[in-house]
């Protein structure tokens, strides 16, 4: 089993402390939510784990290795996959070419194995019918499926999803949830941050709630929903799944 941990993270911008002493853990085979009100520090925390923002204090560790100083591409080699909020698909490449663009970097695979892996992912994600479509021609839900399939092409241990429900048609939300659950069932650890609180809590097994730069609650969705401080600063009294 693999473990991804963030330990005592802190980040300031000039004199403003955005994140203070935040720690979290994601294990293989689980879905974890990182949530909180706007300006609470959740996105900065998420970006520190991804490698987009350098922490002032604390460290990021994967399977006992400190990766805090590694750039994103080296973190990817250690097993961290990342799906950004904005469209990351190569718009002028077909779906198949998008997958092969990542698989070509896999030195552990032969050319034949790369082609076979692309075919497997296309079948698994039910995107055979758009295999030869350009990225720019895909719907929001199709694009998300291709982007997640492409992230898996790198064979990650963990996948970090930034706003996976953003820009997705309501009819596709259940598809995205199923894909996220399938990622967990493959043995991956999944960390999600999203403004769509209801959908995120519905799919995750544990959640961390960030408030004013600190973790104010952690536990199952039911536990954090019933936390009085979380109700007061984030969810309100009437929130239900």
From Swiss-Prot:
Asked whether the keyword Kinase is assigned, the reply is no
Has UniProt tagged this entry with the keyword Translocase?
A: yes
Q: What is its main location?
A: cytoplasm
| Membrane topology, as annotated | Peripheral membrane protein
Instruction: Show which residues constitute the signal peptide.
Output: none
Listed under GO cellular component are: ATP-binding cassette (ABC) transporter complex; cytoplasm; plasma membrane
Residues engaged in binding ATP:
36-43
Keywords of the record: ATP-binding, Cell inner membrane, Cell membrane, Cytoplasm, Membrane, Nucleotide-binding, Translocase, Transport
Q: What class of enzyme is it?
A: translocase
Which Pfam families does this one have? ABC_tran, BCA_ABC_TP_C
Please give the InterPro entries that the UniProt record associates with this protein: AAA+_ATPase, ABC_AA/LPS_Transport, ABC_transporter-like_ATP-bd, ABC_transporter-like_CS, BCA_ABC_TP_C, LPS_export_LptB, P-loop_NTPase
Q: What is its EC number?
A: 7.5.2.-
* Compartment(s) where it occurs, according to its Swiss-Prot or TrEMBL record: Cytoplasm; Cell inner membrane
- Tell me the ranges covered by the ABC transporter domain, including all copies: 4-237
Q: Which family does it belong to?
A: Belongs to the ABC transporter superfamily. Outer membrane lipopolysaccharide export (TC 1.B.42) family.
| Quaternary assembly | Component of the lipopolysaccharide transport and assembly complex. The LptBFG transporter is composed of two ATP-binding proteins (LptB) and two transmembrane proteins (LptF and LptG).
**What function does this protein fulfil?**
Part of the ABC transporter complex LptBFG involved in the translocation of lipopolysaccharide (LPS) from the inner membrane to the outer membrane. Probably responsible for energy coupling to the transport system.
The entry's protein name is Lipopolysaccharide export system ATP-binding protein LptB
| Annotated source species | Haemophilus influenzae (strain ATCC 51907 / DSM 11121 / KW20 / Rd)
Phylogenetic lineage: Bacteria, Pseudomonadati, Pseudomonadota, Gammaproteobacteria, Pasteurellales
Please name the gene that encodes this protein.
lptB
């Amino acid at each position: 089993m693999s473990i991804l941990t963030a330990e005592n993270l802190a980040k300031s911008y000039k004199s403003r402390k955005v994140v203070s002493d935040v720690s979290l853990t994601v294990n293989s085979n689980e879905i974890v939510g990182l949530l909180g009100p706007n300006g609470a520090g959740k996105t900065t925390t998420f970006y520190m784990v991804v490698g987009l923002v350098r922490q002032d204090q604390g460290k990021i560790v994967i399977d006992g290795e400190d990766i805090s100083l590694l750039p994103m591409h080296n973190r990817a080699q250690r097993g961290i996959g990342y799906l950004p909020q904005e469209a990351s698909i190569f718009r002028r490449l077909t779906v198949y070419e998008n997958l092969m663009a990542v698989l070509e970097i896999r030195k552990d695979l032969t050319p034949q194995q790369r082609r076979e892996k692309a075919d497997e992912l296309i079948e698994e994600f039910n995107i055979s019918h758009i295999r030869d479509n350009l990225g720019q021609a895909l719907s929001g839900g199709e694009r998300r499926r291709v982007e997640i399939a492409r992230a898996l092409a790198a064979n990650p241990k963990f996948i970090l999803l930034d706003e996976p429900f953003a820009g997705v048609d309501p009819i596709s939300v259940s598809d995205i949830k199923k894909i996220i659950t399938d990622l967990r069932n493959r043995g991956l650890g999944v960390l999600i941050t999203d403004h769509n609180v209801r959908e995120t809590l519905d799919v995750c097994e544990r959640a961390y709630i960030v408030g004013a730069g600190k973790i104010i609650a952690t536990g199952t969705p039911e536990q954090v929903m019933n936390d009085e401080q979380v109700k007061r600063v984030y969810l309100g009294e009437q929130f239900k799944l």
